[in-house]
UniProtKB/Swiss-Prot annotation:
It holds the Pfam family FtsX. The lineage of its organism: Bacteria, Pseudomonadati, Pseudomonadota, Gammaproteobacteria, Moraxellales. GO terms for cellular component: plasma membrane. ATP binds at residues 53-60. It is found in: Cell inner membrane. GO terms for biological process: response to antibiotic. It is an enzyme of class 7 (translocase). The gene is macB. Its EC number is 7.6.2.-. It is a multi-pass membrane protein. Belongs to the ABC transporter superfamily. Macrolide exporter (TC 3.A.1.122) family. This is Macrolide export ATP-binding/permease protein MacB. Its main location: membrane. The keyword Translocase applies.
C-alpha cells in the first residue's frame, strides 16, 4: 500500500491498525502459556500511543505483533484494513520495510558499519537509489544532531547518540508507524528527555507513534495510554491536554525507488560488504576455514598437473619408436595354421605401394639379424638392421654426428653403416669421432657414416648389444641373400586418423597379396594405452584429493552455522527493518561462497608454487604441466562447494524468527 492510500485512510478516519480478539500463546515443554488474552484495540493515523505495563505483562509481545515481527495464535489483526494473519514472511517483511520503523531499548545497531550505513540499511532492502539513500541518511542524522557522527561506528557513540541513530533508521523509509520499545530505558535522564521530544516532534509531523514502557512518566507524554496487565488490557484512555497534529508529508520511497534489477544489485553489494566485514572480524577463523579448501584445490590442480607432465614425458619417450606409425610385419597372424608354412610374403614393392598413398609421409623397410662384428682386435656380437632412407624420420632417432642414408645408398647398395651409441662405446671407446672407420660385419666391410644419439627413454629401440644399421638393399644382397623384407614402418600424416590409415593399409595389402599374410601394429594404440592409464591414475589420485575438498566444505558449513548463531541478533535487526528471507539467505550464502572462492584462489596459487618447485628440482626430465581446464574446474568446484555447504546455514538464518533473533545478544 502506498503512502497516498495510507493518508486516504486517515482522512476517512478508518482505523490504521485494528486488533480483534487477539490471543498469543507459547509452548513451554508440555504446557501452553497464554501471554495475551482477547485483546481488542484500534489505533488511528497520527496517534501517539503508550502501552504501559510491568515486566511480563505482555506489552512487548503485543508490540511485536503490531509491528509484524510476530503473529497471533488466534484473533485478527489488520493494518490499513488488510488482515496480516495469513501473510507470508516476505509479505510481512514488505509491511515492515515500507510502513514500520523500530526503536529498540538496546538500539540494535550493526557494530561493524558506520552510523550512516546503519541508517541506510532499511532503504537498501526497499530499493532506494544509492545516492538518495546516503543523502537521506545524512540528512536524518543531521536533523537529530549527529551531523559530525555520520562516519562513526556505534562503539564510538554514547547511548543517547546510538538511540538517535536508531530513530534515524526507523525514519529512513518514511516510518509511517514508529514502534518504540522502552526508548528511554537505557538512557540517562537528559538523553531520555531528548528522545521523548524527538518522538513528539515526529508525531507532530504526522507519524503514528506507539511506545512500550513501564514508566508512567513516559506514558504521560503520549496522547493515549493503554495499560496492560497479565495479558489483559485493563485501561485505555487519552490525555486531555494532548493536541493531535495533522499529517503533512509525502512518500520518500516512491520518489527514489530503483528498478527491480538495480535493487537486487544493491542488496547483493550490501551482502558482499557485510560478508567481507564478517571475514575481517574473524581473520584466523576464516583462514582456518579456508585451509581445507586450499589444500583440496591445490591437491587436485597439482595432481592433474603431475599427471599431465607424466603423460607428456612418457609420450615423448614413445616418440623414439616413431610418432603415429604403423608397422607391417611379415607372416600370418599368430594362431593361423598357415603361419608355419610360409613366412616370406613382404617385398620392397609392398613398402613402396604403401609409401605411394597420400596419407603416408614416409616408409622404411626393415630386416634384422645378429652377426659377429670386428674392428681391429675387438670382436663382438651385434644386431644388424637393414633400413630405408627414411628410417630416421619414421623411428624418431637422431644423429649425434655424421649423416643418414639417401636414395643413392639404397639404389647402389652402398656398404655404409650407421652405429648406435653402444656400438660406438664397444668398438671405438677412445675415438670421439668414428666417421670413416671401417667395421667388418661377418666378412663384409662397412664404413661408418653416422652415429646415433643415445636414447635414454624407457621406450627406446636400443638394446644392450651394439646395433648397426645399413641400407636394406645392401643387407638383402650382401648379408642374407633374400628378396623379402621382414617388415616396414609407415609414418602417417598427423592430420589423418591413425585407425583409418591402418584400415586402408590393411585393405591395400590384402588386395596385393589376396590374403592377410601379414600383421599390423599401430603405435597409436600404445599412446592411447598410456594416455588412458595416466588419466585413470590422475582420476584416482584426484578422487582422493577431492575428499579433502569435501572435508573443507564441511568445515565451511560448520563455521557458517557458528556464524549464524553469533550473528542471530544482526539477522533479527535486518528482518525488523524489512529484509526478505531471500536477502538473509543471500547474505550468508555469499559469505560461504566468498570463503570458498578465496580458498580456491589461494589453492590454485599454492598449486603453482608446488609446480614451480617440482619443475626446478626435476629439471628437463620432469615437468608439471597445468591444464586451464583443471584450473577453471577447480575454481568452479570451490564455488559450488560454497553454494552446497553454505546452503544449510543460510537457510537456517533465513528461517529464524525475528522476535527470537532480536532477543539474543
Amino acid at each position: 500500500m502506498s503512502s497516498q492510500d495510507l493518508y486516504a485512510n486517515a482522512a476517512t478516519d478508518k482505523p490504521l491498525m485494528q486488533v480483534k480478539g487477539l490471543i498469543r500463546e507459547f509452548k513451554a515443554g508440555e504446557q501452553t502459556i497464554r501471554v495475551l488474552h482477547d485483546i481488542n484495540l484500534t489505533i488511528h493515523q497520527g496517534e501517539m500511543v503508550a502501552i504501559i505495563g510491568q515486566s511480563g505483562s505482555g506489552k512487548s509481545t503485543l508490540m511485536n505483533i503490531l509491528g509484524c515481527l510476530d503473529q497471533a495464535t488466534a484473533g485478527d489483526y489488520q493494518v490499513f484494513g488488510q488482515s496480516v494473519n495469513r501473510l507470508a514472511p516476505d509479505e510481512l517483511a514488505k509491511l515492515r520495510r515500507e510502513h514500520f520503523g523500530f526503536i529498540f531499548q538496546r538500539y540494535h545497531l550493526l557494530g561493524d558499519i558506520s552510523a550512516r550505513d546503519n541508517v541506510s540499511v532499511p532503504a537498501v532492502y526497499a530499493g532506494m537509489d544509492g545516492q538518495a539513500r546516503n543523502e537521506r541518511a545524512e540528512q536524518l542524522l543531521s536533523d537529530l544532531g549527529l551531523a559530525d557522527k555520520v562516519n562513526n561506528r556505534p562503539s564510538q557513540l554514547s547511548g543517547g547518540q546510538q538511540q538517535r541513530v536508531s530513530i534515524a533508521r526507523a525514519l529512513m523509509n518514511g516510518g509511517d508507524i514508529i514502534l518504540a520499545d522502552e526508548p528511554t530505558g537505557a538512557l540517562d535522564s537528559k538523553s531520555g528527555k531528548d528522545v521523548v521530544q524527538i518522538l513528539k516532534n515526529l508525531n507532530a509531523q504526522g507519524h503514528t507513534i506507539i511506545m512500550v514502557t513501564h514508566d508512567p512518566g513516559l506514558a504521560a507524554q503520549a496522547e493515549r495510554v493503554i495499560e496492560i496487565k497479565d495479558g489483559y488490557i485493563i485501561a485505555d484512555y487519552k490525555n486531555e491536554d494532548y493536541q493531535r497534529p495533522v499529517a503533512q508529508f509525502s512518500s520518500i520511497i516512491d520518489k527514489h525507488r530503483k528498478s527491480a534489477f538495480g535493487s537486487f544489485i544493491d542488496r547483493l553489494l550490501e551482502s558482499f560488504k557485510m560478508s567481507l566485514l564478517a571475514m575481517r572480524a574473524h581473520k584466523m577463523r576464516t583462514l582456518l576455514t579456508m585451509l581445507g579448501i586450499i589444500i583440496g584445490i591445490a591437491s587436485v590442480v597439482s595432481v592433474v598437473g603431475l599427471g599431465k607432465g607424466s603423460q607428456e614425458q612418457i609420450l615423448s619417450n614413445i616418440s623414439s619408436l616413431g610418432t603415429n606409425t604403423i608397422t607391417i610385419t611379415d607372416g600370418y597372424p599368430y594362431g593361423d595354421p598357415r603361419r608355419q608354412y610360409n613366412d616370406d610374403n613382404l617385398t620392397p614393392q609392398d613398402a613402396q605401394a604403401v609409401a605411394d598413398q597420400p596419407y603416408v609421409l614416409s616408409v622404411s623397410p626393415q630386416l634384422n639379424s645378429n652377426m659377429s662384428v670386428r674392428y681391429r682386435n675387438v670382436q663382438e656380437a651385434a644386431s644388424i638392421s637393414g633400413v630405408g632412407k627414411d628410417y630416421l624420420d619414421v623411428s624418431g632417432e637422431t644423429l649425434a654426428m655424421g649423416q643418414g642414408f639417401d636414395e643413392q645408398s639404397i639404389l647402389r647398395r652402398t656398404q655404409d653403416i650407421i652405429i648406435d651409441s653402444n656400438a660406438h662405446k664397444t668398438f671405438f671407446p677412445t675415438t670421439a669421432n668414428p666417421i670413416g672407420e671401417v667395421l667388418l660385419i661377418g666378412s663384409v666391410p662397412g664404413r661408418v657414416i653416422g652415429v646415433l644419439e643415445p636414447n635414454e627413454g624407457g621406450f627406446s629401440r636400443s638394446v644392450d648389444s651394439p646395433t648397426l644399421y645399413m641400407p636394406y638393399t645392401t643387407m638383402m644382397s650382401r648379408l642374407i641373400g633374400s628378396a623379402y623384407i621382414e617388415s616396414f614402418v609407415a609414418l602417417i600424416d598427423n592430420n589423418i586418423s591413425s585407425s583409418a590409415a591402418e584400415s586402408a593399409i590393411s585393405n591395400l595389402m590384402k588386395s596385393r597379396h589376396g590374403t592377410d599374410d601379414f600383421r599390423i601394429r599401430n603405435s597409436d594404440s600404445i599412446r592411447q594405452t598410456i594416455e588412458s592409464t595416466t588419466a585413470a591414475m590422475t582420476l584416482l589420485i584426484s578422487s582422493i584429493a577431492i575428499i579433502s575438498l569435501i572435508v573443507g566444505g564441511i568445515g565451511v558449513m560448520n563455521i557458517m552455522l557458528v556464524s549464524v548463531t553469533e550473528r542471530t541478533n544482526e539477522i533479527g535487526v535486518r528482518m525488523a527493518v524489512g529484509a526478505r528471507q531471500s536477502d538473509i539467505m543471500q547474505q550468508f550464502l555469499i559469505e560461504a561462497v566468498l570463503v570458498c572462492i578465496l580458498g580456491g584462489l589461494l589453492g590454485i596459487g599454492m598449486a603453482f608454487a608446488i609446480g614451480e618447485l617440482i619443475n626446478r628440482v626435476g629439471g628437463d626430465s620432469f615437468k608439471v604441466i597445468y591444464s586451464s581446464t583443471s584450473i577453471i574446474a577447480a575454481f568452479v568446484c570451490s564455488t559450488l562447494i560454497g553454494v552446497v555447504f553454505g546452503f544449510l546455514p543460510a537457510r537456517n538464518a533465513a528461517k529464524l524468527d525475528p522476535v527470537e533473533a532480536l532477543s539474543r545478544d
